[in-house]
Amino acid sequence: MAHNHSHTESGNSKRLLAAFIITATFMVAEVIGGLLSGSLALLADAGHMLTDAAALFVALVAVRFAQRKPNARHTFGYLRLTTLAAFVNALTLILITAFIFWEAIQRFYDPQPVAGVPMLLVAIAGLLANIVAFWLLHHGSEEKNINVRAAALHVLGDLLGSVGAIAAAIIILYTNWTPIDPILSILVSCLVLRSAWALLKESIHELLEGTPSQLSVEALQKDVTLNIPEVRNIHHVHLWQVGEKPMMTLHAQVVPPHDHDALLRRIQEYLLKHYQIEHATIQMEYQRCDDDHCSFHQENHHLAIHDGEKHDAEGHHHKH
């Protein structure tokens, strides 16, 4: 299994590197083409390609650093670097988008000539580059991690931006209606802004060690207490995420077991199977928790047990 995981990460790394080189190269080409042709739509699409290149780079770094083992100085490893990079990336993208919006508004008041043919040629080349990058990220039978899938979505969004730039170039060539250029540049920038804002919120949430969006502390507490009879209460839960891995610490108030280690393993296996939590630090308690933090959960647990017993009693009564 370890060998297969290494092979998968190697395949992901090669695909990401190839897609990054293609995207970064054509991003530079689009910037040059946009400046020479005077097309703001090309510059906006280049800004979107910058988001793709940054996303691909972050994904590539994540794959590379994920293979490094934690050490005494960095006990969680280096996965938090990818979150920090995503935060900086999102802030940069928002600034770029604001600049494109400002330039587009200025173009409405002071229209600039746009060279349609160079704009069209560069936009077509950018579209082809995005198609190749998108194919690379989807090619192969290996399991692709969330970073690779997210990067593929970025490239798909940029592919649509290239289509917009081509449409603007064709309209300018046949009608000479240059306002279409800033209009489409604003539409492409909106795609970038949406991605950047979502990335900014997600990275801030993770940097502040917020609960992973796919997990619910309340649901987890209820599930564990209802499905493992020896567990009376779960409290003082701390749930956060490092890279793609959820981490957890909790206190479990339990009925004194015959085998402490066996019960501990059952709780850990339940968390792994139902919540994909591989690393959980569990403090077992054999007495009632008097902390205000846990009284609410204890009352809810007793109510759930009472309701369950009442339901069983009613079912038994109906059988008679």
UniProtKB/Swiss-Prot annotation:
Pfam families tied to this protein: Cation_efflux (PF01545)
Location in the cell: Cell inner membrane
Membrane topology: Multi-pass membrane protein
GO cellular component: plasma membrane
Gene Ontology molecular function: any one: zinc ion transmembrane transporter activity
Membrane-spanning residues: 16-36, 43-63, 85-105, 117-137, 153-173, 180-200
First-listed, main subcellular location of the protein, grouped into a coarse class: membrane
InterPro entries per UniProt: Cation_efflux (IPR002524), Cation_efflux_CTD_sf (IPR036837), Cation_efflux_TMD_sf (IPR027469), CDF/SLC30A (IPR050681), Zn_transptr_ZitB (IPR023500)
Keyword list, A-Z: Cell inner membrane, Cell membrane, Ion transport, Membrane, Transmembrane, Transmembrane helix, Transport, Zinc, Zinc transport
Gene3D superfamilies in the record: Cation efflux protein transmembrane domain
Domain of life: Bacteria
NCBIfam families, per database record: CDF (TIGR01297), PRK03557.1 (NF002923)
Family affiliation: Belongs to the cation diffusion facilitator (CDF) transporter (TC 2.A.4) family. SLC30A subfamily.
Biological role stated in the UniProt entry: Involved in zinc efflux across the cytoplasmic membrane, thus reducing zinc accumulation in the cytoplasm and rendering bacteria more resistant to zinc. It may contribute to zinc homeostasis at low concentrations of zinc.
Official protein name in the record: Zinc transporter ZitB
Species whose genome carries this gene: Pectobacterium atrosepticum (strain SCRI 1043 / ATCC BAA-672)
